[in-house]
Amino acid sequence: MEKDTGTTHRRHRPGLRALPSGVALGHLKAASEASELQRSRSLGGLQPEGDPPSRPRKPHKELESEDQGKDPSSNAEDASCQKNLAQDKKESFSTLGKLGHESGKQDPEREKSDLEASMQEVQEGEHADGGLQEAKEQEAESIKLNDLQEEEKASVFVEIDLGDHAEEVVTDAKKEEKPSQMDVEDLSEDEMQTSWVCCIPYSTRKRAKEST
């Protein structure tokens, strides 16, 4: 198609030599514009039916003008977003710094408390060890005393003579028998007196009273 249109234009063109220079240039411009229009129409007609028609391309200047018109608002939004991000970062850093400072303050206190607790544990362990040692010493002393007492008892039983012991037992028995005999004699005399008094007849008593 393009070749045909070119040939037709060439056929209708008059010779450049016959026309003046100004007319020839104007004719060439018109011919070029007409050829471009025909090409655009031919390209638009050759597009497939299913595909949508291609959008006409905007000139570069119009795109630049649109971009320039959109730039101020977008730039303002970008700047505000950047400011917000910077503020968020500052706040996060400040909070982290505060937490670190507080943790730094708390760490010495924790260390002090840990040291005190460890010292108390050590002291308690020492007291417990001392108590165990004292208990062991007391047990050893008690065992020694028991052994000594048992040895003394065994030696006493061994040193006693049977003869002396028998004599002591006999003397003790004699001493016990003497007071018992005395008691029996006293009782017999009392009983005799009472019995003799009781045996006096009643008439003799009256006579004794009258004689007095």
Swiss-Prot record:
Record region (Disordered): 1-148, 168-190
Coiled-coil residues: none
InterPro entries xref list: C13orf46-like (IPR040020)
Cleaved signal peptide residues: none
Basic and acidic residues bias (residue ranges): 61-70, 99-115, 124-144, 168-180
Compositionally biased intervals (Polar residues): 71-85
Domain of life: Eukaryota
Name of this protein: Uncharacterized protein C13orf46
Protein species of origin: Homo sapiens
Gene coding for it: C13orf46
